């Protein structure tokens, strides 16, 4: 399944864009926690994401949201200056597949979109922490790349239907906070790895 908030800021440890059973299917695992989208125009970057870190929300891309619709598929429309971008998310249950379609509705000059996935590869009841065992490497796949942080997990494929350049730059981001977990008195800080 896919589960997050309307502004795509995870507040629970079981939130994620790719949460699925592995092995015997009794437990769900968060593979893809979230995805940062950045609109680039005139060499300026506008990150559409919002994340909570200790004492701060950063980036604050929620301010660019102009519309949200839940049906027929979750759809968010962003406006950044002269750029209007629509994001539609469709979960294909039987295939354990998430499709995200970006449509550039309006732009007055050349515009690029940069995507940065944040990976957890963990049981949905646990939290991920930076470690030296995670494999941040990516491998070429048709239309994109595949990665797997730990050997016992399935490959996660990230593919596009357009020509795209993947820049490998594996790195840990520290102390993502999940507000609802904190409110309930549970552990609420997590580190996530981005492959690039």
Predicted segments, located by residue:
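Terminal accessory carbohydrate-recognition/targeting modules of carbohydrate-active enzymes
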Residues: 1-196
């Amino acid at each position: 399944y896919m589960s997050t908030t309307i502004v795509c800021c995870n507040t629970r440890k079981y939130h994620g864009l790719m949460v699925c059973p592995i092995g015997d299917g009794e437990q769900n695992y968060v593979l893809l926690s979230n995805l940062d989208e950045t609109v680039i125009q005139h060499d300026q970057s506008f990150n559409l994401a919002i994340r909570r870190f200790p004492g701060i929300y950063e980036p604050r891309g929620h301010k660019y949201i102009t519309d949200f619709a839940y049906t027929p598929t979750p759809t968010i429309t962003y406006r950044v200056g002269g750029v209007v971008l629509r994001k539609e998310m469709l979960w294909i249950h039987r295939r354990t597949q998430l499709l995200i379609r970006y449509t550039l509705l309006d732009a007055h000059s050349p515009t690029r979109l940069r995507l940065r996935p944040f990976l957890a590869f963990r049981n949905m009841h646990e939290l991920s922490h930076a470690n030296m065992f995670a494999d941040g490497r990516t491998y070429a796949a048709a239309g994109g790349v595949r990665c797997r942080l730990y050997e016992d997990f399935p490959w996660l494929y990230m593919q596009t239907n357009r020509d795209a350049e993947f820049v490998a730059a594996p790195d840990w981001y520290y102390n993502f906070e999940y507000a609802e977990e904190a409110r309930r008195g549970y552990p609420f800080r997590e580190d996530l790895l981005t492959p690039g």
